[in-house]
């Protein structure tokens, strides 16, 4: 299993084996079962331990424990990232998060600077019943002074940063964000939340609900 990814992928075959869904199995069926299994097999606990251990190795300072869950019924492929303040620590962004898996990473503030952690990551998936793809944005800010915030949205493939510029996301969206964010597009739903303090979880759940 790739670094920073937790849980056994949930496929159509997984769903058929449960006997809970009528065939033919659809993407929504696979996504629905993944949502039901969000904490199955200790994968959520293992993802949390992973970021907790990264933070322990990192030491003192502002650090954001990022946890992303895929319940889209499709694979999320890493597309791009942006750092406004700080950087990812020790392990890369997960390259692929399959349906039913958690992805995890730690983002930390710039060393020796009076600045917090602020970043964004974009994952790409197929649009349901289409050959086209869409981009999922998950972004967070933990300023040196001020409140924490998250912002998420779903847009067309290649939206970032040519249409949704990083300056716009940071100065208009993140700076006016709260501790929760939700967006829907293409039938998908993206939900994000962040804790308080200088070391906390920032969580994103990407869904394809009925």
From Swiss-Prot:
Pfam families found in the cross-reference section: Nakanori (PF21230)
The entry sums up its family as follows: Belongs to the jasmonate-induced protein family.
Q: According to the lineage, what is the superkingdom?
A: Eukaryota
InterPro entries (UniProt xref): Jasmonate-induced_protein, Nakanori
PANTHER family (UniProt xref): 23 KDA JASMONATE-INDUCED PROTEIN-LIKE (PTHR36482:SF5), OSJNBA0024J22.15 PROTEIN (PTHR36482)
Q: Kindly provide the name given to this protein in its UniProt entry.
A: 23 kDa jasmonate-induced protein
Inducers of expression:
By jasmonate.
């Amino acid at each position: 299993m790739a670094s920073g990814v937790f849980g056994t992928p949930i496929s159509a075959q997984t769903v058929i084996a449960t006997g809970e869904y009528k065939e033919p199995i659809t993407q929504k069926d696979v996504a629905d079962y993944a949502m039901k299994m969000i904490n199955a097999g200790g994968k959520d606990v293992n993802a949390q331990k992973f970021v907790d251990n990264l933070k322990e190795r990192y030491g003192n300072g502002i650090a954001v424990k990022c946890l992303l869950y895929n319940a889209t019924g499709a694979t999320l492929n890493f597309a791009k990232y942006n750092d406004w303040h700080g950087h990812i620590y020790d392990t890369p962004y997960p390259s692929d998060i399959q349906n039913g898996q958690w992805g995890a990473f730690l983002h930390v503030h710039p060393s020796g600077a009076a600045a917090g952690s602020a970043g964004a990551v974009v994952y790409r998936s197929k649009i349901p019943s289409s050959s086209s793809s869409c981009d999922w944005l998950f972004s967070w800010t933990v300023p040196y002074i001020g409140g924490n915030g998250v912002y998420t949205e779903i847009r067309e493939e290649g939206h970032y940063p040519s249409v949704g510029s990083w300056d716009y996301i940071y100065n208009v969206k993140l700076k006016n964000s709260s501790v929760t964010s939700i967006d829907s597009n293409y039938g998908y739903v993206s939900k994000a939340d962040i804790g308080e303090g200088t070391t906390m979880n920032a969580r994103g759940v990407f869904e394809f609900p009925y």
